[in-house]
Amino acid sequence: MIDREINPYVDEWEKEGQFPAHALFKKMGDAGLLGVDKPVAFGGSGLDFSYAMICSESLGLVNGGSVPMGTGVQISMATPALARYGSDELRREFLAPSITGDYVACLGVSETGAGSDVASIKTTARSDGDDYVINGGKMWITNGTQADWMCLLANTGEGPVHRNKSLICLPMKTKGVEVLRKLDKLGMHCSDTAEIKFTDVRVPKRNRIGEEGKGFTYQMLQFQEERLWAVAACLKSHEKTIDETIDYTRARKAFGKPLLDNQVIHFRLAELKTEVELLRSLLYRACEEYINGNDVTPLATMGKLKAGRLGREIPDACLQYWGGMGFMNETRVSRAYRDRRLTSIGGGADEVMLSVLCKYMGTLPEQ
């Protein structure tokens, strides 16, 4: 599918500023890729989480990070809590068509003043009879301009910030939902990213996922799958960047010999290849622990942190060896340089990952 339905069109989609999510997700849905780890009763394959990781790792062969990221939202970011905690009615209405690719999903968590600090979100869903009335806004929403529904995190109460939030399935065509703008980004050019505003948006309370006030907890669980997806999606991409750099530096001659013959280059590429393989081993261990029902927060956090670091280190080192050609948009290494920078920011910044790890290690200073 990647060679036939995606890679031939990526350059065109990059220029257009988005990939056709509905058309592509429908093809993925027909192939059974969007619900590999989701319940059979709602159109999924009922397999374990490792199969979602196989999908993610395979998508690393796409010529850019946009399609893997948008697909990751559909599989491992906007739907895990719905699949696990949603009512059968909600799962029929939102999960089933997301698995078939008839619906495009997005995740509404981040806000202008609350990115990694999820507890500080300001969007509210006020109780009004059998409905919630939603006001506020969300920022940096992947798939936001094309989505049919949003898995929205909003404040539904006045209590402590970790116990006053709920996840709500919000149809994007509901009155009062407004896409303010499509955001212009450094990288991930064919992944549409939106700023979205909510003005007196009314949705029935039956659209809430699970219990009221449990949204923060549910979202933290979704973050684990999101972070593991991000790790898996970068592996083959990094390997491809390294392999293409080997090919280029072997063919490119300077001062009478191939660039690759310089020890500083072939040693560095060997180091980077080792780093990728070590990250893969960490991912596979975390995946096994997750399947066995264990808390993978430390392992997923370590993986996300390392993936973010390598997302800067590998494209930067490889681009340097491409020299002037690496600075040209026509080379894939320049796209990797732009796209992979996001891994250190999205889904929890590196600094937040370090804080999480320090908390588990008992080294975080008391507040």
Model-derived segments and spans:
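A short core secondary-structure module
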Residues: D131, N135-V179
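Short Ser/Thr-interspersed hydrophobic loop/turn segments at strand-loop and sheet-helix junctions
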Residues: G32, C55-G60, A154, L170-K175, ...
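Short Gly/Pro-enriched turn/cap motifs at secondary-structure boundaries
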Residues: G72, S98, G113-S116, W140-N143, ...
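Short beta-strand-to-turn element immediately C-terminal to the catalytic PLP-Schiff-base lysine
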Residues: R84-G86, R126, L152-T156, C169-P171, ...
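Alpha-helical interface subdomain recognition
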Residues: M1-V62, G72, Y85-L90, P97-D102, ...
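Helix-loop "lid/cap" segments that line or gate small-molecule binding pockets
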Residues: S76-Y85
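Flexible, small-/acidic-enriched active-site or ligand-binding loops
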Residues: S120, K173-P204
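A short, Trp-centered hydrophobic/proline-enriched beta-strand micro-motif
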Residues: G101-V109, L153
